[in-house]
């Protein structure tokens, strides 16, 4: 099951949280959900070059708070904050509510699955060889601390007559383990031969604070490290 389902959806409530964080009665739920979809679609379309990973929407009472996670916050803010103020006004018009806008910088875009997928899609649109783009992304992610990464590219790769799927993996990506921190992202490359789809899984390690066995495992690891250090002192 872990191989088929979206890894983020599988881990909601375990070690991931929702990107839309609000509650509404049944009469308002549909309207607010479509409003969220319009906000995300508008932000991603207007700020295609800003390397946006995700858009988090929160709704306090009669207000709206939008948080954009981006690897290039300067492109969103603009000169003296002019662009971000223009974006805030547009989002206020879309929601008919007082809207605040926050920008969160992504420090390591090389291990963010969505940004990796967007980067590969842009390279394919510039006619870079898909194997080179995939291998470069894998090497960058592993160099910057990812424990594993898998990339799938599908479509008419390299202009082939028959569509196919190619994948590249390095390290380990445990999709069935719920405590594993697996990031997932997708993108589409609009090439001259058709649309190519890119899927990226990045394994960043295990999140143990939600695991009931975590304290016992940490104690065991501490005992093992302590005994090994004692042995080193005795040998010295």
Curated annotation (Swiss-Prot):
<dbReference type="InterPro" id="IPR005704">
    <property type="entry name" value="Ribosomal_uS3_bac-typ"/>
</dbReference>
<dbReference type="GO" id="GO:0022627">
    <property type="term" value="C:cytosolic small ribosomal subunit"/>
</dbReference>
<dbReference type="InterPro" id="IPR015946">
    <property type="entry name" value="KH_dom-like_a/b"/>
</dbReference>
<comment type="subunit">
    <text>Part of the 30S ribosomal subunit. Forms a tight complex with proteins S10 and S14.</text>
</comment>
<feature type="domain" description="KH type-2">
    <location>
        <begin position="39"/>
        <end position="107"/>
    </location>
</feature>
<feature type="region of interest" description="Disordered">
    <location>
        <begin position="214"/>
        <end position="236"/>
    </location>
</feature>
<keyword id="KW-0689">Ribosomal protein</keyword>
<keyword id="KW-0694">RNA-binding</keyword>
<protein>
    <recommendedName>
        <fullName>Small ribosomal subunit protein uS3</fullName>
    </recommendedName>
</protein>
<dbReference type="InterPro" id="IPR004044">
    <property type="entry name" value="KH_dom_type_2"/>
</dbReference>
<dbReference type="InterPro" id="IPR001351">
    <property type="entry name" value="Ribosomal_uS3_C"/>
</dbReference>
<dbReference type="GO" id="GO:0019843">
    <property type="term" value="F:rRNA binding"/>
</dbReference>
<dbReference type="InterPro" id="IPR036419">
    <property type="entry name" value="Ribosomal_S3_C_sf"/>
</dbReference>
<dbReference type="InterPro" id="IPR018280">
    <property type="entry name" value="Ribosomal_uS3_CS"/>
</dbReference>
<comment type="similarity">
    <text>Belongs to the universal ribosomal protein uS3 family.</text>
</comment>
<comment type="function">
    <text>Binds the lower part of the 30S subunit head. Binds mRNA in the 70S ribosome, positioning it for translation.</text>
</comment>
<dbReference type="Pfam" id="PF00189">
    <property type="entry name" value="Ribosomal_S3_C"/>
</dbReference>
<dbReference type="GO" id="GO:0003735">
    <property type="term" value="F:structural constituent of ribosome"/>
</dbReference>
<dbReference type="Pfam" id="PF07650">
    <property type="entry name" value="KH_2"/>
</dbReference>
<dbReference type="GO" id="GO:0006412">
    <property type="term" value="P:translation"/>
</dbReference>
<keyword id="KW-0687">Ribonucleoprotein</keyword>
<keyword id="KW-0699">rRNA-binding</keyword>
<dbReference type="InterPro" id="IPR004087">
    <property type="entry name" value="KH_dom"/>
</dbReference>
<dbReference type="InterPro" id="IPR009019">
    <property type="entry name" value="KH_sf_prok-type"/>
</dbReference>
<dbReference type="GO" id="GO:0003729">
    <property type="term" value="F:mRNA binding"/>
</dbReference>
